[in-house]
Amino acid sequence: MNRKIENHFLYVEVSDRGAELMRIMRKDTGAEILWNGDPAFWSYRSPILFPNVGSTWQKKMKINGKEYQTRQHGFAREKEFTCVEEGTEKLRYRLMSDEETRKYYPFDFVLWVEFGY
């Protein structure tokens, strides 16, 4: 689901999937600020890269003697975030660790993402 916020100058859309900015448009000119996500080239627009940026050596990491598989740019960009606050000028999202995330990142976490003016 895409959620929207705006003020006098900007119109913004954010996806619950990955808490990713999908659109930033200037209201005065109609100019689009973000890449349009053309899947022929790159379907993302502004992904949140967590818990790692890029790839790890052989797509693995070792923590406390145990090996874990990693994913390029982490997993947050593919997870559904919970929108915990939604207003006309503010969105606040939360992603919490779960059984699936612990397969790749063996720590409990809460990742907060906030958009607003």
Predicted segment positions?
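Surface-exposed acidic/polar loop and edge beta-strand patches at domain peripheries
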Residues: 1-117
